[in-house]
Structures are given as C-alpha cells and as structure tokens.
C-alpha cells in the first residue's frame, strides 16, 4: 500500500471513530435501552388489559388440554437453567398428565436445546421480544416464569423484564400466571417498579425465604419453595466415565472438578455507544454479549478476574503438592469457556475441559457426578452433584451458594470470589473435601432430602392454584395440600430414591 493511501486510511479510520463515538453518545443520551424495553413491555401489558374484554384470547375450557408457556433462559447452553426447567416440566407432566397438557417453551437458540424438554414445543425468542410475547401469551392458557434469577438486576434487566412481561400479560388476560422456583434480589428502580405493578396478580413460589421477603416488600404475594433441579437424571455413569477416560483419566485416580466463571463482568447492560463502535470499527469484541448488550469490562474487571483465577490455580497447586488428582475444568455455560481456558493456562496447561458448548446437560452432569470432589462458582454444578453425594464447595459471587451451604449446615464451604486469602482457604477446603468426604456427604444427603420435600410441597401449592382457577380441570385424587408432598414429585432416579428411603430419608 502506497504511503498516500496509508495516510488516507488512517485519517478515514480516525474519522469513523469520531463519528461512531459522537453517534453512540447521542444515542445513549437519547434513551436507556433497558428502560425502553421495560416501557415497551409495560405498554403492551396495558394494551392486553384493554383488549381483554373484547378479545380475551385463549381461555381454558373443560375437555381441552391446558396450554402453558414456560418462559426462561433456555437456548444459551446454561446447564443450570436447562436442568431446572427440564425437571419443572417433568413435575408438571407428572401432576397434570400429558393428555391434559399442551406445553411450549421459549428458547433463544433452538439448535442449542434440540433434544431437550420432551413433549414440549420450542418457540424461538427474538432479541426484541415484547410484541412477540404479546402475541404468544394471547394464545396460551397460562405462563410459567422459570428463570432462576427471576427478579434481579445482577445479571441482566432484560431477562427479568421478560419474566415480568410474561407474568403481566398472563395476569392481564386472567390466565394462569406462575413464577416457579425463582429468586428476587437487588433490582434497579425501574425494574422494581415493573415488578411491583405487573406481578401483583401473579402467583410466585420463590426459591427461598429471602426472595419471599423481597417480593412481599413490593406488595407481591409469594410462597417459599426451592430450586427444581434436585430430581434431574443425567446420562448413566458409564457416559461420564467414558468421557473422562477419553480425556486421559485412568479410571482410578480421584477426579477433582473445578468450575470457574467470570464473576466480575456482570451485569450485562445495553450500551448504544459501544454498539455503534462495535458495528463500525469492530471494537469491544471481548465484552460483547448480544445485540447492544455488553458485559462489564475494563482494566479493573480484568485485574479482579485474574486475581480470582490465580488464587484458584495457586490453591489447587498447593493441594496437589502432596496429593494425586485428575483435575478437570468444567464450563456449565458456554460463556465459561474463556474462564476455563484461562485457568487451564495458570495451572500449566494440559487439563481436560468439559464445556456446555460441546456437551449437553445429560453428559455434562454425568461427568461431574464422577468427581471425588467439586469446587464451583456455578450454583447448579453443586446442586446437580449433590444427589450423587459428591463432596463439594463453592467460590461464590452472590447469595445463592452461601444459602445452599447454609442449608447443608456447612457455611464454611462457601468461599468468596474476592477473598484476598482465597488460595489459602481453597487449599484447606480441598483437604477437607478429600479427607472427610463422608462428613461432607452426610450434610449433602440431608439437604437433598429436605429440598425434595420442599419441591414436593411446591407441587401441592401448584395443584391448589390450578384447582382454584379451573375447578373443572381433571386433577387426580390425592393431589394437593391434603396429600403427601412426596406424591407431587416426578419419578425419582433410583439413586435419589435410595437417598429418600435411606436412614436419613423421610419415607
């Protein structure tokens, strides 16, 4: 390239950069994309309420199957989100029967949920979803909001706006509107207002008491429940063992599974300036999430992430000085691959990676069920290994893992992502998991059985809600609050049934 042309290209690039920056700043000042989305959703809920007297949409009649739409975070290969919904669907099918249900579920990418959610129609969710939800809910008899982080600004306001939108639209058309097993936490003021206004007529069975209190403070009635992943049945152990052996495991050495994340790049927020700069100049690729949404980024985020991964690597190295273990790195969501690769490098490389972009939820959970110990920053990696009594600890960014360890009476097994002594504490924690697996597993078993009972009670509450709204709906005798919570669970995998019937069980 000739020097004059090089000069022209440099000037053109600078000009484009200035144009992109100015355009982005003007767009950002003109509108907050999160608030715009919330206002759009609110307007359509109000429109649905006005439309209802003239056009109520689908309304259940005796003899028809009950049409329910599950609204969540499926289609991103987030293993936890998919597992909890898989079990939710199994519970609904158990309670109401396939002959009486017509189920649909939202998915961000149908290719990533292919083979999941048997008997359920998958509906692709567009990036700009308010009008889609307005039309889709109109054709249903009810909405089941099923995202775990149901009412939170911690990860993305857009996701909670989707949850509120589904519930609000269903309530506006006098349909079933249920939030099932989700959490409420700290919310931006605009999202809090949306929840307060449009979830007041929904029925929320939250994941814990803290969420109930949070919702009650907003004037939203809620019952306490639990997560719904406890009954999940992964692929057979032989699948997990085969995958591990293909990765170099000898079949005998203890397996240590580490599940890192990037806890510092949340929340995902819209940034129109960055969106313009990415489109025009290809900038911000590492921070880009989707559309005009970007992860929190910058030198401070990178430094905190590096410190977190370095501490995990150092604590693991110290532990392995006198121990032998086959270390594997597990990404429970596709987004975790970068963290797994970075941790692998800090451990010297050569550690096998098992990430959800390559392994479905059945295979991935089968892999981690083979571990002798698990340390995870992913809540559902811990939950899905607990029925297998895998000794586990967490390195947590929020209250979910803290609450889980407290429920096990093992709060000391919840480490913190920003602990300046994380390496030291991790070394000691790994020693405990390997030296006292029976003691750790005893707390795990009691917690699993307790949470299964709570999940059964959630089924009882759900039955009573449907019965009150649709007295003519054919519900089996013995179901509801007059029955046993254990009859309201889907079929338990054999090893889980043994936990329930064993010395620590309830039956």
Q: Language-model features: where?
A:
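Active-site anion-handling motifs in enzyme catalytic cores
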Residues: 2-507
């Amino acid at each position: 390239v000739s020097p004059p042309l090089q000069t022209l290209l440099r000037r053109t690039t600078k000009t484009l950069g200035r144009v992109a920056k100015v355009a982005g700043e003007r767009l950002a000042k003109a509108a907050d994309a999160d608030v715009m989305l919330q206002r759009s959703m609110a307007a359509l809920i109000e429109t649905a309420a006005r439309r209802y007297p003239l056009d109520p949409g689908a309304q259940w009649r005796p003899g028809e199957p009950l049409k329910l739409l599950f609204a969540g975070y499926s289609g991103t290969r987030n293993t936890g989100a998919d597992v909890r919904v898989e079990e939710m669907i199994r519970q609904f099918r158990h309670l109401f029967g396939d002959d009486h249900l017509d189920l649909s579920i939202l998915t961000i990418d149908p290719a990533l949920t292919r083979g999941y959610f048997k008997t359920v129609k998958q509906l692709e969710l567009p990036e700009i979803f308010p009008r889609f939800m307005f039309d889709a809910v109109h054709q249903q008899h009810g909405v089941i909001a099923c995202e775990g982080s149901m009412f939170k600004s911690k990860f993305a306001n857009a996701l909670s706006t989707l949850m509120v939108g589904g519930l609000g639209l269903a309530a506006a058309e006098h349909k079933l509107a249920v939030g099932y097993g989700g959490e409420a936490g700290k919310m931006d003021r605009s999202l809090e207002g949306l929840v307060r206004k449009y979830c007041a007529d929904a029925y929320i069975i939250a994941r814990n008491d803290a969420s109930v209190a949070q919702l009650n403070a907003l004037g939203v009635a809620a019952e306490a429940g639990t997560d719904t992943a406890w009954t999940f049945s992964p692929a057979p152990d032989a699948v997990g063992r085969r995958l591990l052996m293909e990765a170099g495991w000898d079949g005998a050495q203890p397996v240590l599974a580490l599940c890192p994340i990037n806890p510092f790049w949340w929340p995902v927020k819209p940034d129109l300036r960055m969106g313009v700069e990415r489109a025009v100049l290809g900038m911000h690729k590492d921070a880009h999430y989707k559309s005009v949404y970007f992860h929190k980024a910058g030198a401070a985020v990178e430094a905190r992430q590096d410190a977190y991964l370095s501490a995990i690597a150092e604590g693991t190295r110290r532990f392995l000085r006198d121990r032998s273990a086959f270390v594997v790195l597990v990404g429970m969501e596709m987004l975790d691959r970068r963290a797994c690769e970075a941790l692998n490098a800090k451990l010297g490389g050569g550690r096998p990676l098992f990430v959800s972009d390559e392994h479905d939820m059945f295979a991935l959970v089968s892999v981690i069920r083979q571990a002798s110990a698990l340390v995870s920053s992913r809540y559902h990696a811990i939950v899905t290994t607990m029925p297998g009594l895998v000794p586990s600890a967490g390195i947590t960014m929020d209250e979910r893992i803290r609450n889980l360890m407290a429920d096990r009476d093992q709060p000391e097994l919840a480490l913190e992502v920003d602990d300046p002594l994380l390496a030291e504490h991790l070394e000691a924690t790994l020693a405990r998991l390997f030296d006292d697996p029976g003691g750790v597993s005893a707390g795990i078993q009691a917690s699993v059985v307790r949470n299964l009972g709570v999940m059964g009670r959630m089924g009882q509450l759900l039955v009573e809600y449907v019965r009150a709204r649709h007295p003519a709906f054919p519900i089996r005798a013995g179901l509801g609050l007059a029955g046993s919570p254990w009859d309201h669970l889907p079929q338990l995998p054999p090893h889980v049934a043994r936990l329930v019937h064993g010395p620590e069980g309830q039956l």
